[in-house]
Swiss-Prot record:
Key words of the record: Amino-acid biosynthesis, Branched-chain amino acid biosynthesis, Cytoplasm, Leucine biosynthesis, Manganese, Metal-binding, Transferase
The protein's name: 2-isopropylmalate synthase
Highest rank taxon of the organism: Bacteria
Species of the source: Hydrogenovibrio crunogenus (strain DSM 25203 / XCL-2) (Thiomicrospira crunogena)
MF terms (GO), sorted A to Z: 2-isopropylmalate synthase activity; acetyl-CoA C-acetyltransferase activity; manganese ion binding
Record region (Regulatory domain): 394-514
Amino acid sequence: MKEELVIFDTTLRDGEQSPGASMTKEEKVRIAKQLEKLRVNVIEAGFPAASQGDFESVQAVASAVKDSTVCGLARAVENDIVRAGEAIKLANSGRIHTFIATSPIHMEKKLKMSPDEVVERAVWAVKRARDFTDNVEFSPEDAGRSELDFLCRVIEAAIDAGATTINIPDTVGYNVPEQFGELFHQLLNRIPNADKAIFSAHCHNDLGLAVANSLAAVKSGARQVECTINGLGERAGNTALEEVVMAVRTRQDWFDVDTRIHTPEILAASRLVAGITGFAVQPNKAIVGTNAFSHESGIHQDGVLKHRETYEIMRAEDVGWSTNKMVLGKHSGRSAFRSRLKELGIEFETEQELSDAFISFKELADRKHEIYDEDIQALVTDNNTRRVENETFRLVALKVGTQTGDAPTATITLWIDGEEKTASSEGGGVVDATFKAIEKLVDSGATLELYSVSNVTNGTDSLGETTVRMEKAGRIVNGQGADTDIVTASAKAYINALNKLIDTGSKEHPQAHV
């Protein structure tokens, strides 16, 4: 019987620290529910002491998730630990993850504490966290650059104090696989009480080695890996959940562990996170990129047709790629739509949400002859995106015009706090004109940081997905929109971002570098 490798997902905490990836409370809950479908063991939902918004997000995830452990991050200080404990109180299974830096440069320059003081603080933090839960994780921040003897000392003390998981972070992505694997080997063999805790790896991808380092740690005895969907994270990102899971699953001849992850939900999780954060997945990304299971070479194509395993080491269906491309059309009824949603793993909390999605589907089917799985997923994402709490702005109508030699124009009507208002503008293109017309009505004062468009499927009638990123006074939000008309999709995305920008529930939080 293989040992279980615990999958600890930190998309909602460390992943959100990627500049521009900030999420609303509702978006975090949606992602958490998908992670629960994926059967992730632990969901790190946020940093409760960072802000009231983050506290409420962790609390909301703790209430919504039933089958995964919900974790809150806390520095080794009283307020952080208390806030984390309060935030996870409603969880069926809760964990507090507390940390303090242990590398010489961090202790001297950042903490201004002696090694003895750091050990004392670590012990206190673990004991204080256990006042709220028996499930306590301790991280020696920047462990990869810490002195081995001191690292052993502080970890032994933390386990004695009651830590049940010891996480070893390569905070700045400095380690290489052989070195990181050897570190785990040393820790597990030198620390007398190492068998009393699960050892975990948390790697950053600054040198492109996050997954390799994590797998090296697993080979040396780590039994938890901290990761994010799509490898999302600050700087170059974190360990990609989908890559670790499928590496372990595919190479059962090499690894002595397996995970409980329900892999057919991987692609849905990837698309949801990409859609909400606005961080598109590159086509050649392992497991979830659109080219991950494509074969251009004639020799490869011939081999795959004769026997799949000649050039494919895993099945596309095992991670959620559908072999059934064309699914529905304009004559499809509600029951067929509901059935296909179920096959795609898409669920709605209320019949009204299903009805709204079906109406959107019928509208799309009138404009698009063939409806694909990707269209349905984009349509549902678009509907969820527009379901914003305290919605202030809503698109009512949009008319654009362009002619060679003349400036493109746009006339837009918005519903603003219960009243319809209309404005027109010219621009360098129809999208530019549309955004300028919107600004005539709302005067947001925000700066457009990113505008990107991607097609959901092939063909000129494909749904287009648009992402905009806006910044105002240090706050960054993402907006998404989807439509067969790319200008309409752009307007939807811009309006979605504006609604988030004026939502006072959104927050700006300090970075936690674990």
